[in-house]
Amino acid sequence: MFALLSCIGISQTYVPDDNFEQRLIDLGYDIGPLDDNVPTTNINGVIDLDVDGLGILDLTGIEAFSALETFTCQSNNLTSLDLTQNTSLTQLFCGNNQLSNLDITQNPNLIILWCDFNQITSLDVTQNPSLISLRCENNLLTNLDVIQNPSLNVLVCENNQIASLDVSQNNTLSRFQCGNNLLSNLNLSNNPSLTFFTCENNQITSLDVSINTQLINLNCAFNELTELDISNNSNVTQLDCSNNNLCRLNLRNGNNGNITAMDFRANPDLNCVVVDNPSGNHSTWEPVSFSNYIASQNDCSNFVNVDTLDNVVTNISYTLPALINGNYFEQSGGNGIQYNTGDTITNSQTIYIYNETACDSNESSFSILIIEDDYYIPKYFTPNNDGRHDFWQVFDSNNSVKMTHIFDKYGKLLKSLTPNSQGWNGTFNGNPLNTDDYWYVVTLNSGEVIRGHFALKR
């Protein structure tokens, strides 16, 4: 048969793979039987060819499809693919094979390339300026240069070994998936059209999505982020930022009610989350048990536990007790000398208890007043419920006070205090009194009466 065709001048294309040739027979490009040859004139004008899932090992002969524009050869057993002669190719789908190399430098008209689920170690798309959709996920790529692909709309390159990726020239990118790589940073400032972005399982320490106002889906889980702010992303419906090192999470985008899936679990130092409405319904968000929702990041320090101690008045030294939350310091903010449990304080001073996490800090303070007299009468107090000077009382170190009476400037009795009482909180009949001077009459056990005045400051 071959000799006869040769005699009458019909050119043949060598197709050694029987599964490939059988597919061409089924499509009517050959009449059989299987003889490893197909008439070239039957295939050199074919525009669209689909040979998916046929167990093909060898696509020798594809070079004769010189007019081919769309080629689909997914889910075969290909280890190599030579398309250098198919210069009209615009769409190539060759995923789920065993390709280790793919040369598309001779296919300048490509607009779609899907080569996912192979073993490709290097992919050069710099000669494909019209590329709109690139899917190369689940390969062995260590780098990917898409700078020469300004029209790229879809880029899926997850599950590779890519350490850096520059998408600054891809300003029409709307879907970008780069999870499970080795990325430590990403710059999305030139991708304003981004709607679907996933970068989970990388090593990213910082992520700025303030310019990506069209974002709907964001997955940045399993990275090393310390803060994330989606206050400019009012279209977000799904966010997964779990398993990071978040200290700051700002979800106040004016549209929290539009969120259908939220997960910020496994951020152990995240004390609070900024939201639209702290008292709103967040019952579907993960973790369900989280409740520290606030309206401003400035409120976050309130969630760091720190021990508090009452002010101390003594005529002897004072020994610092053990703390659960925080450490003793000479100055505010964890500065100055650090004191330890059991240290003996012999002079009057204010001591600060400072506690910090990787994200936030909080502190309290108390005063130690060491007096030589039997009693001490404070000159002022500040009843504002901050834990400091909230009560006025006479400090009696030797049980010398019998009773204390407090009056306003008109002589009205406001409060009577026994020696062991907590003190006066600045109220009368449950109502807080104004900033002013108030008078005391202290009666000692000896019968001596001491009179004077002190200030209430609010």
Model-identified regions with their sequence ranges:
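Solvent-exposed segments in extracellular or luminal domains encompassing
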Residues: I337-Y354, Q422-G423
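Append "Rare intracellular matches occur via the same short Y/T/C beta-strand/loop motifs
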Residues: V46-G53, R175, G326-Y328, T346-C359, ...
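Canonical leucine-rich repeat
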Residues: L59-I62, L81, L102, L123, ...
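Consensus "Asn ladder" position of solenoid repeat domains
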Residues: L54, N76, N97, N118, ...
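Short loop/turn motifs at secondary-structure boundaries
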Residues: E372-R458
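N-terminal capping/linker segments that flank leucine-rich repeat
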Residues: C7-T70, T87, Q106-P108, Q127, ...
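Conserved hydrophobic beta-strand positions in leucine-rich repeat
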Residues: I47-L49, F71-C73, T90-C94, L113-C115, ...
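Solvent-exposed, low-complexity, repeat-rich "mucin-like" stalks and linkers
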Residues: S301-E330, N398
